[in-house]
């Protein structure tokens, strides 16, 4: 791979730090893969999501889709460990890609061969983040449009949404579905009652995205959608929208974890290949949050 000569141990270094983070934070893996996803969907996988406001940069973190995004401290720890071994060599964009494999695999999911050699951008794109990031309130047509913009298809949409087999969501992103006088017909009534109870302590309360095996990377995300127990609209619509090709794909992954794992790895590679900066474009940031 790209770092064979310059930083041969990079994957192990990253994996070790992710493993350490998981000891005290069960959501560490979900945080990291979400950063990679939100990075790739805006100007390609260029580390732009990590930049904070600074001279010449208006951060993407002000976009609604990035409002609750976390995990920067873990990225900083990974970057520090990698810099110690190979200073000035590995980009922050590549760190997110490598960390995503470790995050999934350490939770019981698949491995895939990450292509490396991305460079870090010297700019952010706030408007791109506002327009391009999928929202938890969207229907299949809206979601497909956003995936299509970055050349990802329906299989990619359904496979990558499967990353919601771990991690959590705040109640504010689905509580409009819990209205007692106007119940959402695609939400299991018993499960809706559990969610109402969980969310009674406030809209900022966190709830597991996968109520069955919340920290395990498995196919239960899809079987949950079959039983109408996906808390987010943007997940449930993949199975509950009649006539959409996404329904068949959900059923396929629900029936075969091997099929899901294989497709997930391929879709992660596809996503990781969105418009990377290479060669002498961009830079290798020494601090992932700041331009050099």
UniProtKB/Swiss-Prot annotation:
Its EC number is 1.11.1.7. One of its GO terms (biological process) is hydrogen peroxide catabolic process. The record marks 34 as: Transition state stabilizer. Heme b binds at residue 164. The keyword Oxidoreductase applies. Ca(2+) 2 binds at residues 165, 210, 213, 218. Glycans are attached at residues 68, 139, 179. SUPFAM superfamilies: Heme-dependent peroxidases. Its cofactor is Ca(2+); heme b. Disulfide bonds join 7-86, 40-45, 92-288, 171-199. GO terms for molecular function: heme binding; lactoperoxidase activity; metal ion binding. Ca(2+) 1 binds at residues 39, 42, 44, 46, 48. It catalyses: 2 a phenolic donor + H2O2 = 2 a phenolic radical donor + 2 H2O. The active site is at residue 38. Substrate binds at residue 134. Binds 2 calcium ions per subunit. Binds 1 heme b (iron(II)-protoporphyrin IX) group per subunit. Keywords: Calcium, Disulfide bond, Glycoprotein, Heme, Hydrogen peroxide, Iron, Metal-binding, Oxidoreductase, Peroxidase. Removal of H(2)O(2), oxidation of toxic reductants, biosynthesis and degradation of lignin, suberization, auxin catabolism, response to environmental stresses such as wounding, pathogen attack and oxidative stress. These functions might be dependent on each isozyme/isoform in each plant tissue. Belongs to the peroxidase family. Classical plant (class III) peroxidase subfamily. This is Peroxidase 2. The lineage of its organism: Eukaryota, Viridiplantae, Streptophyta, Embryophyta, Tracheophyta.
């Amino acid at each position: 791979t790209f770092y064979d000569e310059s930083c041969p141990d990079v994957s192990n270094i990253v994996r070790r730090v992710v493993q350490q983070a998981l000891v005290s934070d069960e959501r560490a893996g979900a945080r990291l893969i979400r950063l990679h996803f939100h990075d790739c969907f805006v100007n390609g996988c260029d580390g732009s999501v990590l930049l904070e406001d600074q001279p010449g940069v208006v951060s993407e973190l002000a976009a609604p889709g990035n409002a609750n995004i976390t995990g920067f401290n873990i990225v900083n720890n990974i970057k520090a460990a990698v810099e110690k071994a190979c200073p000035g060599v590995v980009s922050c964009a590549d760190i997110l890609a490598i960390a995503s494999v470790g995050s999934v695999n350490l939770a019981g999911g698949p491995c895939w061969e990450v292509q490396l050699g991305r460079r870090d951008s010297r700019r952010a794109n706030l408007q791109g983040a506002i327009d391009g990031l999928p929202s938890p309130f969207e229907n299949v047509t809206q979601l497909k449009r956003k995936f299509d913009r970055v050349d990802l298809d329906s299989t990619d949409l359904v496979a990558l949404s499967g990353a919601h087999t771990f991690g959590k969501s705040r109640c504010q992103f689905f509580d409009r579905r819990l209205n007692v006088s106007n119940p959402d017909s695609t939400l299991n009534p018993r499960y809706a009652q559990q969610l109402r109870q969980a969310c009674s302590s406030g809209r900022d309360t966190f709830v597991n995205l996968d109520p069955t095996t919340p920290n395990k990377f498995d196919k239960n995300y899809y079987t949950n959608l079959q039983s109408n127990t996906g808390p987010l609209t943007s997940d449930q619509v993949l199975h509950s929208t009649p006539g959409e090709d996404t329904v068949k794909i959900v059923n396929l992954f629900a029936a075969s974890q091997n099929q899901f794992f294989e497709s997930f790895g391929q879709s992660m590679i596809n996503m990781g290949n969105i418009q990377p900066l290479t060669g002498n474009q961009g830079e290798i940031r020494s601090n992932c949050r700041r331009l050099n």
